[in-house]
Amino acid sequence: MITASDSTSWLHCHGRIWLDKFQPAGEAVEPSEFDKLIIRMGEGHEWNIKRELARQYQLVEAVSEDHTRALMEAGAQIIYQGQLSEGDIIGKPDFLIRLESGQYQAADAKLARSEEKKEIQIQLGIYRKLLGNGLNALVFLGTGDVTEIGEEADKDVEKFLQSMREILAMKAMPQVRYSESKCRACTYFNICKPQFEAKGELTLLYGIDSRAALGLEKQGIDTIRKLADANPAQIEDVPYLKGYEKRYRAVLQAKSYFDDSIHQLKPITLPNGTWIHFDVEANPLSDNGEDHVYLWGLLKPPYNGQAFEYIWTDSEKQDREGWEAFLAKIAEYRAQYTDLVLAHFSGYEVQKIKAYADRYQMHEHPTVAWLLGDNTPLFDLLEPIKECIVLPVASYGLKYICKHPKLVNFQWDDSDSGSQWSVVQYVNYLGELRPDDRERLKRNILTYNFDDVMGTRKLEEWVRTREVVDHPA
């Protein structure tokens, strides 16, 4: 059977939805702590919507499809957890709302900030199909807005249903590609990853996506081993691997997969000056729907525990207060270090500074203008690494590079910590009433953020052991 909620796994990966339907015997699949948090928050949002509707209307919970039909025939104002089906399709809308015409309108409570997410479009589109009355479906968003989904979702619904029927008819899992970011977070990672490794799947390599892999396979290069042995000058251009330099990097990436080799393509240019390492932690699940940066972490000389400084906010109510405290701290550093380099890893920190400048209309603020101007002290350490070095990692993320024993070999205090982990810790912190446990959660997050900025510092030190060219800050 095909359920409306299958759309999430289907959009993520066709292999994942096949495994959802034909789960291997003996394989225990446990959602991550972050997924559990999302489920818990989603259930809380649904309960709040249910409570508000129950205050205004007669609300009855359905226990089966027959019961749902009976409630509809009886004219119940709102049916909670109704069950609908047609052929091989099953739908369980959170709410069926009776209109004055006597027709029922499907509605779901979604923690999302927008109804544009494809899985929501498909799921609500299926409810519309099952009801068959042409009414738009409602979405009670996490932002408090109520939006509608209509016939614009019909094409995606039909595409989903056709694909699902093809997948369910397969005797074995469909052939899919590997994606480090998507697969690493999947509950079936430990099932699928060994299969990708056994076949030498090209997309295990950083920089090789499904389109590039297909182009290489058409040339007979269908494994990592074959790519490592290939002559880049003899490889034809393929999507996203156009030009000799990109093909050469792909071959080197394949070689490093087997022998952990490091290949420096050209000298790395780093700015001179006093480096202060910078990292932020944000909560994307805030009540107002905007990312709340609750921790601005900074590591200044002499780069030890005592040199770790931070701005912390206890809730999104202190959002502006935390932002302005961060700007004040940067102004303090600017006065103290005339050659300041504010080093970070990847573009995330700059994105957040821009977002906060927009949020509070502070682009003219002198510190903001400096941070976002032509003479910015901000320096993304990832950029010269990606440009100048090929590393034996599946992803050029900070932890991949730092934790590798043949690279930086810096380890985080909590090996399970990460960006999603920190969100879980902070949301738990917000809901924790016991002072000791609340302080423990805060301390765990601060330790993680300290490790992030220290990891960036250790990465800088490691990069400086390579061939480096300094330039003025």
PLM segments and residue spans:
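Active-site-adjacent bridging/hinge elements
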Residues: L96-A106, G297-K300, N304, S422-D436
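Short, amphipathic alpha-helical segments that act as regulatory/interfacial helices
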Residues: E46, K50, A54, R128, ...
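Metal-dependent nuclease catalytic cores that hydrolyze phosphodiester bonds in DNA/RNA
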Residues: M1-S101
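Acidic, Mg2+-coordinating catalytic module of metal-dependent nucleases/exonucleases
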Residues: V139, G144, G150-A153, V157-K199, ...
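Generic beta-strand/beta-sheet core signal
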Residues: A107, A230, F278, L299-P301, ...
